[in-house]
Amino acid sequence: MESLLEFRKRKDEFLKTGTESPIPVEERTSFAGLKYFPDDPKLRFLVPLARVPEEELEFETSSGEKKIFKRIGKLGFSVEGQPVQITLYQAASGSFFLPFRDATSGKETYGAGRYLEVEEKDGKFELDFNYAYNPYCAYSSGYSCPLPPVENWLKVPIAAGEKNYLDKRDATERERGQSND
């Protein structure tokens, strides 16, 4: 896995200049990069997968359509002394999918939740929430993003990864001191 700093730099560059960037073209010239939580080594885990009977599920999306994922197991860890269980899914392509909401959702982070890419290493899964990211829907309408199912709504805060994306309107209001933050 590339370093966190390299990952963030590459992502910011893609969002500002990439032809596939979800940020509207008219906002890219003023895009100064995403806001992130500081790196937190306590939010990195290497955990075994507790397999569950595989089941295909329909996920709601931000556009109202449905997407199919397969539930493959549960991952357990602790955050601030609180036990947490999160469900891991698999897309039709075979890639793992870990969508979640947490106690920061709708406050410091995107309200609909974030995603985390995970890798399997020697039978365990590496979860590094410092790499948690917003779905494209956080940046612009017109995308159909799977919403985290209720079983992945965590009660603990995951203060790691990407924070809320602020559009130009929000940034202008902040500059004028009109924000409630």
Language model region names:
Residues 46-48, 78-80, 89, 101, ...:
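A structural detector for beta-sheet-dominated domains
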Residues 41, 71-73, 82, 94-96, ...:
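A generic structural signal for short beta-strands and their flanking turns/coil linkers
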Residues 102-133:
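Acidic, glycine-rich flexible loop segments
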